Amino acid sequence: MRAVIQRVQKSSVTVDGHVVGSIGPGLLVLLGVAGNDEQKDAEFLANKITSLRIFEDDAGKMNRSVIDTGGGVLVVSQFTLLADCRKGRRPSFVQAAEPRKAEALYLAFVEAVKNRGLTTATGTFGAMMDVSLVNDGPVTFVIESQ
């Protein structure tokens, strides 16, 4: 599993002109599921992302997690994160999980985040989405489960 996480002041996702998920301050998580991912990868990433101390404390140091701040998490599926662009001019997506497996693990990740007591919103799996965000920092990380 590969995730791009961005600290945001706010973020939303729109499908067919309708907002399907939004948060205030917190994290936007773009999540890609690989073909060899398992339930343990979803749990690992959910724990890592929600515990990562990337929010500033009163001294201005990155010392607080999204759990500590009470922020929200917006999770958006993005299989293109698994693209291999090393050869040729067209990305290869053979490392990405097939849709049924990817959706199941995406939902497992979302559930694991919710189980940590965080306000959690999502996009629509497999849909064309418009994602809006106001970066905070900007602070952006790429995290992998393997």
UniProtKB/Swiss-Prot annotation:
<dbReference type="InterPro" id="IPR023509">
    <property type="entry name" value="DTD-like_sf"/>
</dbReference>
<comment type="subunit">
    <text>Homodimer.</text>
</comment>
<dbReference type="GO" id="GO:0000049">
    <property type="term" value="F:tRNA binding"/>
</dbReference>
<dbReference type="Pfam" id="PF02580">
    <property type="entry name" value="Tyr_Deacylase"/>
</dbReference>
<feature type="short sequence motif" description="Gly-cisPro motif, important for rejection of L-amino acids">
    <location>
        <begin position="137"/>
        <end position="138"/>
    </location>
</feature>
<dbReference type="GO" id="GO:0043908">
    <property type="term" value="F:Ser(Gly)-tRNA(Ala) hydrolase activity"/>
</dbReference>
<dbReference type="GO" id="GO:0051500">
    <property type="term" value="F:D-tyrosyl-tRNA(Tyr) deacylase activity"/>
</dbReference>
<dbReference type="GO" id="GO:0019478">
    <property type="term" value="P:D-amino acid catabolic process"/>
</dbReference>
<dbReference type="GO" id="GO:0106026">
    <property type="term" value="F:Gly-tRNA(Ala) deacylase activity"/>
</dbReference>
<dbReference type="InterPro" id="IPR003732">
    <property type="entry name" value="Daa-tRNA_deacyls_DTD"/>
</dbReference>
<dbReference type="GO" id="GO:0005737">
    <property type="term" value="C:cytoplasm"/>
</dbReference>
<comment type="function">
    <text>An aminoacyl-tRNA editing enzyme that deacylates mischarged D-aminoacyl-tRNAs. Also deacylates mischarged glycyl-tRNA(Ala), protecting cells against glycine mischarging by AlaRS. Acts via tRNA-based rather than protein-based catalysis; rejects L-amino acids rather than detecting D-amino acids in the active site. By recycling D-aminoacyl-tRNA to D-amino acids and free tRNA molecules, this enzyme counteracts the toxicity associated with the formation of D-aminoacyl-tRNA entities in vivo and helps enforce protein L-homochirality.</text>
</comment>
<comment type="similarity">
    <text>Belongs to the DTD family.</text>
</comment>
<keyword id="KW-0378">Hydrolase</keyword>
<protein>
    <recommendedName>
        <fullName>D-aminoacyl-tRNA deacylase</fullName>
        <ecNumber>3.1.1.96</ecNumber>
    </recommendedName>
</protein>
<keyword id="KW-0963">Cytoplasm</keyword>
<keyword id="KW-0820">tRNA-binding</keyword>
<keyword id="KW-0694">RNA-binding</keyword>
